[in-house]
């Protein structure tokens, strides 16, 4: 009520009245904003007894903080999904991994394959048995002649033939050269992924020398198509065995230099010891083979357990690991290179004279000298390379100890000159399937070390 009395005083009740002749000049129109608006009596009486009742919105209203900044809501933290590859330099080809990361820790690793799929197994069905051979060079394109060896032995089983002893010794010789080629690539690129560049450049110089042996014996540095059903394509050139002997003497020093760089290196051990551990039970359950199986402590080598060609006539040891980690697998590969040198020296010492192809005109082409003088030999050669030879009906599974593991060929013949079905068992496929188990709980940088120790090549995985 005191406010109402003040309003009456302000609005004229009991206030002096200004007249025109009083000497005070009144403005004709007050300027805008000159006086502050004051509520009149009626307005004050109208709202004097108003009461604000709370509504649903106003009941929960809280005044904003003093600096008028909204409080941040807590958000549920989710794992990050990261695409690794296929263009990553450490992916070893066209590997694509979808990684689920919790910070730097790997929670899930999902490999995506098929980016190098060429339909090789189907293409083989449209080729003769000899024309299908070069496809095997392109599967594991780091260990070429070992793939040819598996296919050739499978065809020879179906044909029920056996190559001459000299051809078998040549196969073993170049199979072990191929094993060293593969292990050089595996060990040095693994080191390169982790950060050691020097072994890569040192050992690739030695690799070029072995490519020269390939070239001298077949004309090609990589995709040789040299080991064929019935033997090998041609005999060794003069002086090749002497050069291989000189190489094998000096190569052991190169292995020692690489071991000096890596084996006791503190950084290398920190990046490989207790990384990617695989127990013997897990290795068997996943179907691992080769170094991945032997690194876990299982002494299984098809050259010992199921000898082929002349592996039962050579002496060598099978190195195994004890912990099943990346470091053990590295040591196994280094020791396997030394054992391959032992086998190469035995092949050089025991190389017998004689033929290099089976003495069966239905399988082996005639010699070049005969083709220059005999029309029948020329026709025979032409028909053999265009139509091929008929293989009796049957099926066989043939496996060899390739550098990466058990490389198997399941071959089905229907009696024609073309395979009815050819199924290829690649060792790297099972190893890649175990990548999720091996990398779970490790850091993102350790995934690169695990991929390197698996020695993955996508030519054989995608096929």
UniProtKB/Swiss-Prot annotation:
EC category name: translocase
Keywords assigned: 4Fe-4S, Acetylation, Electron transport, Iron, Iron-sulfur, Membrane, Metal-binding, Methylation, Mitochondrion, Mitochondrion inner membrane, NAD, Oxidoreductase, Respiratory chain, Transit peptide, Translocase, Transport, Ubiquinone
Entry superkingdom: Eukaryota
Chain positions with Symmetric dimethylarginine modification: 118
FT transit peptide: 1-33
Necessary cofactors: [4Fe-4S] cluster
UniProt-listed InterPro entries: NADH_Q_OxRdtase_suD, NADH_UbQ_OxRdtase_49kDa_CS, NDH1_su_D/H, NiFe-Hase_large
Catalytic activity: a ubiquinone + NADH + 5 H(+)(in) = a ubiquinol + NAD(+) + 4 H(+)(out)
Keyword Lipid metabolism: no
Compartments reported by the entry: Mitochondrion inner membrane
GO BP terms, alphabetized: aerobic respiration; cellular response to oxygen levels; gliogenesis; mitochondrial electron transport, NADH to ubiquinone; mitochondrial respiratory chain complex I assembly; neural precursor cell proliferation; neurogenesis; proton motive force-driven mitochondrial ATP synthesis
Post-translational modification: Dimethylation at Arg-118 by NDUFAF7 takes place after NDUFS2 assembles into the complex I, leading to stabilize the early intermediate complex.
Subunit structure: Core subunit of respiratory chain NADH dehydrogenase (Complex I) which is composed of 45 different subunits. Component of the iron-sulfur (IP) fragment of the enzyme. Interacts with NDUFAF3. Interacts with NDUFAF7. Interacts with CERS2.
Protein's UniProt name: NADH dehydrogenase [ubiquinone] iron-sulfur protein 2, mitochondrial
Source organism per UniProt: Mus musculus (Mouse)
